[in-house]
Regions:
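Active-site and NAD+-binding cores of ADP-ribose-processing enzymes
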Residues: 1-14, 18-44, 69-193
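Extended catalytic/binding region for NAD+/ADP-ribose chemistry, centered on the ART fold
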Residues: 42-68, 139-142
Length: 193
């Protein structure tokens, strides 16, 4: 097989044939399951992929900004601009809901899931993710820990997602210590002769 194509596809054997998706947007969906983060993530110990998304651009920026900040500080990166693509997709599966409660139920849920929603320690959330995935769960939704008004989803199975497509391109400016600003990139403009 062509090594370049193999690198683009990732480790396809991580996804069972019946869970694989194809067609428009499939590469974007499958990438989360075939290109693993060896360090793990909120709901994965690094041995399997999870497709993470946020309900809004503001929440996505907060979540991505946090994780990129951790990486850029750890690698002591100088000022730079990071280009990101906003992807929209439909979640077409029933998810375990850690975010949907209101009133008293919301308070009880917050107490019950406090360890799972810890902003820095992922031990409890990785245990929960492993248990839910092993039980065949499609994924879960939870209140963002980086944006108090936001919600996130973590999808364990590619077939839960449909119609993934690029919606916008944004750039986040890293000033060497933090993200100072972001902007949406517009369409191309012809350069005058």
């Amino acid at each position: 097989a062509n090594p370049r194509v193999r690198d683009e596809i990732g480790e396809l054997s991580l996804v069972s044939p019946e869970e694989r998706v194809s067609g428009p947007g499939a590469t974007t969906i499958m990438a989360a399951f075939t290109h693993l983060n060896a360090e793990g993530s909120r709901f994965s110990d690094g041995s399997y992929g999870v497709y993470y998304a946020a309900h809004s651009l503001a929440t996505a920026r907060a979540e991505v900004g946090h994780h990129r900040t951790v990486f850029l500080r750890r690698t002591d990166e100088p000022a730079l601009e990071i280009d990101l693509r906003l992807i929209t997709a439909n979640v077409e599966a029933e998810l375990h809901d850690l975010a949907g409660a209101e009133g008293e139920a919301a308070l009880r849920a917050a107490q019950r899931f406090a360890a799972v929603l810890d902003p820095d320690d992922y031990a409890a959330s990785q245990r929960l993710g492993r248990q839910l995935r092993a039980a065949g769960s499609w994924g879960l939704r939870w209140p963002s820990v980086r944006d108090p008004r936001g919600e996130c989803v973590g999808i364990f199975r590619p077939r839960a997602l449909r119609h993934a497509k690029a919606a916008a391109h944004i750039a986040m400016h890293w000033d060497g210590t933090r993200f100072s600003h972001w902007y949406e990139k517009g369409g191309p403009h012809t350069v005058g002769v």
